[in-house]
Amino acid sequence: MVASIAGEEEPAAEKSQQSPDHFQPYRPYYYPPYRGYPITYPYPYPHGYPKPYHNFQTIAKPNEGPTDQPEANSANSIEEGGVSKRLFIEPIFNLFRPRPRDPIVVNQAPPPPPVIYQAPPPPPPPPIFQQAPPTIYQQPSPTIIQQAPQPSVTKLVYSQPEPSHSVIYQTQPKTELVYLNQ
């Protein structure tokens, strides 16, 4: 019994958890403003309330047909005994209409110039090694040295003891003394 009751209650609990908007993204509902509440636009009215930027020039007055005078058919015209709706409604919507504001200029340095990517230059072509022509070494011509004729040298042989100097060179006549004690 308990198992059957628990088994019957489980599908009911699952149905209660699964709401129709369970799989829809959460969107909060904005209630329409009551009297005296500040109106903030844009206001997401789900029931199709007129937008605050509606052009009141195009709204035709009820129970009036088209006339030859275009000003009489517009909301900006002043009726007999009354004032135009535009004079009251337009300023209210202008309070909440976003106005263009001057941009806040801060003393900043000028932005750096954009970096333009420049591809590196291509590498230089490999050097072409040209074989130099073989150097021909020319042997110099042999120089012939001609020896001048030497003057005749007379050798004088003495049998005397060696003096203080062994060789005596004389210029004219050129003589060479050779001793036996050498």
Swiss-Prot record:
It is found in: Secreted. Structural protein of a layer within the wall of the spermatophore produced probably by cell type 4 of the bean-shaped gland (BAG). Fixation in the spermatophore seems to require covalent cross-linking of spermatophorins. The keyword Secreted applies. Spermatophore. Residues 1-26, 56-79, 104-136 are annotated as: Disordered. Transmembrane segments: none annotated. The keyword Transport does not apply. Keywords: Repeat, Secreted, Signal. This is Spermatophorin SP23. One of its GO terms (cellular component) is extracellular region. The gene is SP23. Residues 1-7 form the signal peptide. It comes from Tenebrio molitor. Residues 109-128 have a biased composition (Pro residues). Its main location: secreted.
